[in-house]
Amino acid sequence: LDVHKGDDTLYNLEADAKTMMTKLGITDFDQPVEQLSGGQKKRLALVAALVAPADILVLDEPTNHLDHAMSDWLEEFLKKWRGALIMVTHDRYFLDSVTNRIVEIDKGKIYSDGICGEIILTPYMTPCII
């Protein structure tokens, strides 16, 4: 998959979306959204976010409702992402794998800033000076 699309045609976007849907376990492309399970709807929304050309990608718990193979695919996809990634997740190791900087924020205060390995060694909720 071409992660940064540029001037893709509608056909290429549809092909990319179908490839992503298949990787995320959705293979019936004609099934109405209303008939999808909650997890399938979340995965479909993830595909919509990933296929759209963007400079910033915002994801909320992207590995929820994904099995191990799907998470691995998403991890590889995000490693190739050429834009900024803002993600809310409890999976720090996934986060460390797909980002080069992590900022931990709680109640409007920055508590950690760095890479996951450093943040895990930092006492929880110790404010950082940046």
Regions found by a protein language model. Give the residues of each.
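ABC ATP-binding cassette signature C-motif
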Residues: 1-129
